[in-house]
Amino acid sequence: YNHVLELDPKDEMAYNNRGNAKAGLGKWQEAILDYQKATEIAPNFAFARANYALALYETSQTDKAIREMRNIVRKYPRFADMRAALTAAYWVTGNIGEAESNWVAAYGLDTRYKDMNWVTNIRRWPPSMVVALNKFLNLQ
């Protein structure tokens, strides 16, 4: 991705993908910077914004992460990924009603979020978000 960015420093997909690579290595702060850059270049790049929100959550910036998730859902109400993320974040912060409401929407849009293997290994959510969603699914 570094080479792609040398050739085209305005490639939002390369920033997002490099952010994903850094997140996979546990370099969350570096990932956040790449996701931010991707969204600066392309403000409507919903998945870069979603990845940014998830990375914020992983770095314990919970309020900021939830605010970003809510903003994404406001703009893209059928974005199952952020509905599921809000479910998890709200559940562990004790906002049960909001968690359940977002889950109805998320599950209605994409049933894969009930499969923790998919969330962990295919979608590759951050560990803290996986734990939070698992707590919701197991009513803990």
Please annotate each region the language model reported:
Residues 103-140:
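Terminal, low-structured helical/coil segments at or just beyond the last alpha-helical repeat
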Residues 2, 13-24, 33-35, 47-54, ...:
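Conserved alpha-helical positions within TPR/SEL1-like repeat arrays
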Residues 74, 78-80, 84-114:
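TPR/TPR-like (Sel1-like) alpha-helical repeat modules
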Residues 3-6, 36-40, 70-74, 108:
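Conserved structural position within tetratricopeptide repeats
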